[in-house]
């Protein structure tokens, strides 16, 4: 999603920020910086919601080149629902990359497996029963599950908790 690019860029910056500050022994600065990136994510998320709720139809026509009402309706339904969760997606990106900056490689990998399992579950169970509505629900709901997992992993990380030597 084009609207996720600011969050992806911030995530790359956070990864560098976290790793440099870990090397400098600045645990509190890491925590403060990551929390501030979450505020950025929520502001970007609100902006995304406003833009996509106001201009989803026009953007769908512009990107698809089609004026088919069924196609445009499906696109609009998806992007508007996903827009509501765009702040969550930003927090997911920041947290995943902050963990990588801390040197935690396994947890972000587990998060990717959660995403894969969730998508398979939706494809096998929910899409046959609910149709396109399940497709719309799939990614944003998986983002929420992954974000909770990553937040727990970040804030219970031994370095972040202060139980690992700096």
What is the meaning of each model-derived region?
Residues 9, 50, 116-117, 144:
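Hydrophobic/small/kink-forming positions within alpha-helical transmembrane segments
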Residues 104-107, 122, 133:
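A short pocket-lining beta-strand/turn micro-motif at the edge of beta-sheets
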Residues 1-56, 89-111:
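Small-residue-rich hydrophobic transmembrane alpha-helices
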Residues 23, 115-118:
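Alpha-helical transmembrane segments of multi-pass membrane proteins
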Residues 118-127:
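Transmembrane alpha-helical segments of integral membrane proteins
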Residues 14, 83, 95, 121-122:
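Hydrophobic alpha-helical segments typical of transmembrane helices
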Residues 18-84, 126-166:
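Short alpha-helical transmembrane segments in multi-pass integral membrane proteins
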Residues 89-92, 118, 146-149:
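Membrane-embedded alpha-helical transmembrane segments of multi-pass integral membrane proteins
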């Amino acid at each position: 999603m084009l609207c996720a690019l600011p969050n992806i860029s911030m995530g790359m910056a956070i990864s560098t920020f976290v790793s440099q500050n870990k090397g400098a022994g600045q645990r509190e600065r890491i925590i403060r910086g990551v929390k501030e990136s979450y505020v950025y994510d929520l502001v970007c998320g609100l902006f995304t919601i406003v833009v996509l709720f106001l201009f989803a139809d026009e953007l769908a026509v512009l990107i698809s080149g089609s004026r088919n009402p069924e196609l445009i309706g499906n696109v609009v339904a998806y992007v508007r629902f996903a827009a509501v969760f765009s702040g969550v997606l930003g927090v997911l990106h920041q947290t995943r990359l902050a963990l990588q900056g801390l040197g935690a490689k396994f947890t972000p990998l587990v998060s990717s497996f959660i995403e894969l399992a969730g998508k398979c579950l939706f494809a096998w169970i929910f899409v046959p029963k609910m149709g396109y509505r399940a497709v719309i629900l799939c990614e944003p709901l998986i983002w929420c599950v992954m974000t909770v997992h990553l937040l727990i992993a970040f804030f219970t990380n031994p370095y972040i908790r202060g139980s690992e030597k700096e």
